[in-house]
A protein has these predicted regions:
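Glycine-rich beta-strand-to-loop/alpha-helix junction loops that act as flexible
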Residues: 24-26, 81-89, 160, 214, ...
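N-terminal small/polar loop signature for handling phosphorylated ligands or for N-terminal nucleophile
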Residues: 39-92, 96-99
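Proline/glycine-rich low-complexity loops and linkers
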Residues: 64-67, 91-176
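Glycine- and acidic-residue-enriched helix-capping/strand-helix junction motifs
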Residues: 28-38
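Conserved short beta-strand edge segments in small beta-sheet-based binding/regulatory domains
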Residues: 246-256
Length: 256
């Protein structure tokens, strides 16, 4: 199991909605395919005001999927899975999600009817397998989609194909909208070593704000990009103003 970003940044006193992404697929772990869904969802969730806390990449193994989904479901408001929902032998995400919640895998009559209507006489066992769902799961329908999104409690099961993943998420994205993040960015010509103590001081004095420092070695106009972020707009502005006091005024290229 590969986990990215398992540590949590400072949490604002304002309650944040949190999310985890579970990417499922041996092909991702072996380098046969490149995951594009997590990076897309990271950007989308942040724009919606949802704090991503965890990204997990795991193999196509039922028990591993069940354990990861259960853990992420317990610790986050939303969980999004990517991959493992096709008709072949290695598509075991549905079984893993069902096991995470102690449920059986059952054939959903609405999905079966949709599949039979779509494929007609071409329906077979492999295609009908796409109607299998964890018992008690929800089908989320939208006008923009032919096929619904499957949800099991706070877990949203999405396909691994990037085009389909995006379409399905975009159809349901507004249900996740939360209070937005407020971000200010300072670009400075000062070296990161020279501003480190000042950043530490401001971070300590403004615990409700997350401050990031990102040096660059390829730009001529600035050397460090500093981001100040929080759900609380006034807190961001106070931290920004304090940082501007500490930085050499002539070194600040721009503030966004």
């Amino acid at each position: 199991m590969l986990t990215i970003g398992d540590s949590s940044p400072r949490i604002s006193p304002m309650r944040q909605k949190t999310a985890a992404i579970v990417v499922i697929g041996n092909e991702i772990l072996t380098g046969k395919s490149e995951d594009k869904n997590a990076s897309f969802l990271i950007t989308e969730l942040h724009a919606l005001g949802v704090a991503l806390r965890r990204v997990v990449i795991i193999p196509d193994e039922v028990e591993v999927i069940a354990a990861a989904v259960r853990e992420c479901s317990d610790g986050h408001d939303y969980v999004f899975t990517s991959g493992g929902v096709g008709p072949t032998h290695d598509d075991v995400t549905i079984e893993g999600v069902a096991r995470a919640f102690g449920r059986e895998v059952v054939r959903h009559p609405d999905l079966e009817a949709m599949l039979r209507g779509y494929f007609g006489d071409g329906i077979d066992a492999a295609r009908l397998r796409m109607a299998d769902t964890p018992q008690g799961s929800e089908l989320i329908k939208a006008e923009a989609m032919r096929w619904p999104v499957l949800a099991m409690q706070n877990v949203y099961v999405l396909p691994g194909v990037p085009e389909l993943f995006r379409k399905k998420f975009e159809a349901i994205r507004e249900r996740f909208r939360a209070e937005p993040f407020h971000v200010h960015t300072i670009y400075t010509r000062q070296d990161e070593f020279d501003i480190a103590s000042g950043l530490d001081s401001v971070a300590a004095d403004h615990p409700q704000v997350e401050i990031g420092s990102y040096p660059t070695f390829t730009r001529d106009d600035y050397r460090v990009k500093i981001t100040i972020e929080s759900k609380e707009k006034s807190a961001v502005e106070r931290a920004r103003d304090k940082l501007l006091e500490l930085l050499d005024s002539g070194s600040v290229v721009k503030v966004e």
